[in-house]
Amino acid sequence: MGLLSLAIWTPIFFGVVLLALGRDDQARMVRWLALIGSLVSLLVTLPLYSRFDTSSSAMQFVEKTPWIERFNVWYHLGVDGIAFWFILLTAFITVVVVISAWEVITERVNQYMGAFLILSGLMIGVFCALDGILFYTFFEATLIPMYLIIGIWGGPNKIYAAFKFFLYTLLGSLLMLVALIYLYTKAGGSFEILTWHKLPLSMSAQTLLFFAFLAAFAVKVPMWPVHTWLPDVHVEAPTGGSAVLAAIMLKLGAYGFLRFSLPIAPDAAHEYAWLMIGLSIIAVIYVGLVAMVQQDMKKLVAYSSVAHMGFVTLGFFIFSDIGVSGGLVQMIAHGFVSAAMFLCIGVLYDRVHSRQIASYGGVVNTMPNFAAFAILFAMANCGLPATAGFVGEWMVILGAVKANFWLGLAAATALIFGAAYTLWMVKRVYLGPIANDDVRALTDINAREFLMLSLLAIAVLYMGLYPKPFTDVMNASVADLLKHVSASKL
């Protein structure tokens, strides 16, 4: 087995073993097995980093075996600088989520942990797949564990949220399947994504393909106006579900743009860049304003996710190396920061069982250690320099200003809104006098919660202070992608 196959199938194997274990009286063993499984899965991805050649833009660690020979479908994996960090991010966040669920999930523990490990493997599969059908299989299969996680361990409205999540994302993907089959016939019966990149296509074909992929990926990102499923799902999902959804699942859509929309339909991408930039700016400004009036902490962070992902799509469609790299860095940073924000809300929810901002106030007085973490992550969420949240946003704004000054100005206003809604939440939840008896009775974080938050805090600070390892890996691949996209296929 190659390294990428190990990265995909190790967590899935542990997940299936956990599902087979069954009863809740084995919960303690199940938790330890889940932790061991997630740690092994993370360790399996580490050799990728030491062996990755940052100077090359080619696919690395390639594996290719026939899968469905009749239709020329291959089990074809490979990773370049664009996909590389998301494999490590997925494995890392899975470890944190297993730790976060330790004492919190008490019913059907084996199914909960199993679902997360299987989901982790499937998401890594999306980032490695180089065959259209393989990509589609992994992309759609991620819906199933997430649907169960929301529908079984979610809040009071969980069934509605799970259905909404499933239908929205599934309907978008159906158009993508049509696009994949069209490309298959065009390419003489090949599902190779890299072959599709070289296909000469007419403008009308590119336009249809571009919008078919847009339907699938915009829902996943989610871009405005198809973002309405996200706040509902985040509010109902359990803490771990929210963390994985925000940190990794949203990235599958943005990754799809770079792997499909831009290289397969470059002329259409340039033609409709104004549309994508417009939708991104709306997401960044309008959704930022919507976040300011939220009373529910999870909804606030959910809307802030839409605004942050607006930066990502903006960076991609200004077609400059600093913009695309900035978008990728923002995706990784948002993975750390959004997971941390949701886990912090989970820490409070486990104690008070309320997500309403009005239920809190003066938490810093009773939980000083926790408040220090929470405020650090909040600062990263508004893009404070020296935190992960700053680097990507700054790169995208720099790229936007180079492309068009007014565009850069519009993007920069988002930082003001980001600071406004985040700091307002911090002020009302953490600062000031103790608001009520619930807050007075709070106990500070235990060792498990401290470990989970400190892992993320280290990641957020390291990435903010020294982003070079992150950008070095992607530079060659981003340059190659832009060279490809700048050449017309007509």
Describe each model-derived feature in a short phrase.
Residues 1-10, 79-90, 132-145, 206-219, ...:
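Structural signature of hydrophobic alpha-helical transmembrane segments
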Residues 2-3, 17-114, 190, 194-198, ...:
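Transmembrane helix-loop-helix hairpins at membrane boundaries of multipass inner-membrane proteins
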Residues 5-21, 35-50, 89-101, 119-121, ...:
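Central hydrophobic cores of alpha-helical transmembrane segments in multi-pass inner-membrane proteins
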Residues 15-20, 46, 95-99, 121-125, ...:
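Alpha-helical transmembrane segments of multipass membrane proteins
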Residues 16-27, 94-106, 148-158, 220-235, ...:
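C-terminal ends of transmembrane helices
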Residues 24-29, 114-118, 122-205, 290-303, ...:
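Alpha-helical multi-pass transmembrane bundles of energy-transducing inner-membrane proteins
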Residues 52-74, 173-228, 232, 257-275, ...:
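Juxtamembrane/interfacial segments at transmembrane-helix boundaries in multi-pass membrane proteins
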Residues 224, 338-341, 408-441:
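Predominantly late transmembrane helices and immediately cytosolic-facing juxtamembrane segments
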